[in-house]
Structures are given as C-alpha cells and as structure tokens.
Regions:
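Beta-rich accessory regions
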Residues: 43-54, 115-155
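Catalytic cores of secreted or luminal carbohydrate-active enzymes
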Residues: 91-133
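Generic preference for well-ordered secondary structure
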Residues: 23, 36, 85, 89-90, ...
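Acidic/polar loop patches that form or flank catalytic/metal-binding clefts of enzymes
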Residues: 7-9, 49-55, 66-72, 111-122
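Extended amphipathic alpha-helical segments enriched in small hydrophobics
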Residues: 30-67
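Extended glycan-interaction surfaces of carbohydrate-active proteins
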Residues: 1-31, 64-87, 103-110, 136-145, ...
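A generic alpha-helix propensity feature with a strong bias for hydrophobic helices
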Residues: 26, 36, 74, 81, ...
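Well-ordered alpha-helical segments within folded domains of soluble proteins
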Residues: 29-45, 92-107, 154
C-alpha cells in the first residue's frame, strides 16, 4: 500500500503525487469511507490480510473522531500531518453509502465468508484492536457468533 494513495485514514481518490491532486478536491484526493471499505474487503479476499486490517482499523479510528458516524468523504491530508481526519466542507453526514462501510470493515477483520451452509470465520486483527465480536449472525448455517483477537506479531 503506497503512501501516495493511503492517507493513514483511508484510500485517497487520487495519489498525492499526481498533478491534479487536491486533498480537499471531491474526486481528486479525498478519502471516501465506502471506497476504502470495498478496497479493504478486496485486499482481504486476495490474501493481503495485514493491509486489509490496516485499512479497516484506520477507518474505524476515523469514525471515532467523527463521533461514530462516517461522512460521505473527508480530506486526504496525511494522518501524520493533521492527527485527525479533516472534514470535507460539503460532505453529507450521515451519508447512506458511508453507513455500510464499518460493516464491511468488520467483515474484512473477521474474515467472514460463506461456503454453502457454512460460515467461514478467519480473523486477522491489527494490534490496535485487541478483540472483536459479532454476535448472532443469521444465514443458511442458522445463527452463529464470530470472535477475533489480536495476536502479537501475527495478522
């Protein structure tokens, strides 16, 4: 994951070294929570467990600073420069598509998938998330609980 696209909070819509990059430009540098969640899930599905966990934990940290509600988009400034996610001036909060992002992040962290009648649980948590639980998951398997815990040095 390059620092050009990863702000420390999520994935930018454009790399920071591109000529048109603008960290508060709607499609040219902002971070979109729903895009980042889809990217995290894709990384997880293709075996990039550590990178997916980094994206998920970073976005969940941003959500805490937005009072547990993710906006449509926020500025793509580097996390080390601002220490908090900078609001995009006209972003909707809440935004319908951003509300699903934390759920997909949790799915990526717990490695939840289905295989016919079975729920697959394959957690990969970053050290910043010690324990994660998702209870009473309905499906063809009936209802199940999923648990994950961080292990030092293992993702």
């Amino acid at each position: 994951m390059s620092d050009e696209l990863f702000s420390g909070w999520g994935v930018r819509t454009m790399g920071s070294k591109e000529g048109s990059y603008n960290p508060i430009g709607y499609h040219v540098g902002t971070v979109w929570p729903h895009d980042t969640s889809i990217i995290a899930w894709g990384m997880r599905r293709y075996g990039y467990r550590t990178e997916a966990a980094t994206l998920a934990s970073s976005m969940l940290a941003a959500a805490e600073l937005f009072h547990e509600r993710l906006p449509e988009a926020f500025a793509g400034y580097p996390r080390q420069d601002t220490h908090y996610p900078v609001e995009y001036p006209t972003a909707c909060l809440p935004q319908a598509w951003a509300t699903g992002a934390p759920l997909l992040m949790v799915r990526a962290l717990l490695g939840l998938d289905s295989d016919g009648q079975h729920l697959i649980i394959d957690p990969a948590l970053p050290p910043s998330i010690e324990r994660l639980e998702l209870l009473d998951i309905p499906g063809a398997w009936g209802r199940m609980d999923a648990f994950g815990r961080a292990r030092r040095g293992v993702h």
